[in-house]
Regions:
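Core alpha/beta catalytic barrel or barrel-like domain that forms the active/cofactor pocket
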Residues: 124, 136-138, 165-169
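The substrate-binding groove and active-site-proximal loops of carbohydrate-active enzymes
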Residues: 95-96, 134-148
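Catalytic domains of carbohydrate-active enzymes, especially glycoside hydrolases
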Residues: 150-169
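Contiguous, structured surface segment used for ligand recognition
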Residues: 2-134
């Protein structure tokens, strides 16, 4: 299985087997994880429901229980905006440097779900940005002025591609 990722991760290796998202799948947050990770979990939950029809529950506990978990965790040891994404036949683990790293790991998993649906190939991805500032410059002075809802949608799209700055002129 060959998948396209934008931007291309720093390290990518495929394994044997697949992980299947189904009705028993859950998104798991450690009870000590920062509250900001919940928004990344909600984003992933919405993507899974849109693409597969399954709506995994979001759980917070000290210890994960069961298989078919999508485990989101923050690790301050990773460099800024870095993450690892491990898809095994049993579980998916995203470990990121606080909120931004976990969010970028979720965005990579969203790209996988859009290409493969509910049956994901096993993969190990380790990624960190090649450039600290990745921006989009939008000249809003010519033509129609963008609405707030359009700018929010644009920010979401830029986040999907791991662009971390939006500049309006």
């Amino acid at each position: 299985v060959f998948m396209i990722f934008l931007p291309q991760p720093s390290s990518l290796s495929y394994g044997e087997g697949t992980f299947t998202i189904h009705y028993d799948s859950r998104i798991f947050l450690d009870s000590e994880s920062p509250a900001e990770l919940f928004s990344a979990a909600q984003l992933l939950q919405q993507e899974i429901e849109t693409q597969t029809g399954f709506r995994p529950a979001i759980c917070r506990r000290h210890q994960p229980v069961g298989s078919h978990l999508i485990y989101l965790t923050a690790s301050p040891e990773l460099s800024r905006e870095a993450y690892t994404l491990a898809v095994t036949p049993e579980n998916i683990t995203i470990c990121g440097s606080l909120k931004s790293g976990v969010l970028y790991g979720v965005q990579t998993l969203r790209q996988m779900i859009r290409q493969a649906g509910a049956v994901l190939p096993t993969v190990l991805i380790s990624d960190k940005p090649a450039m600290e500032n990745r921006g989009f410059y939008h000249d809003a002075t010519r033509g129609r002025v963008p609405t707030l809802s359009y700018l929010k949608q644009l920010a979401d799209t830029l986040s999907f591609y791991k662009i971390n700055q939006l500049q309006l002129y």
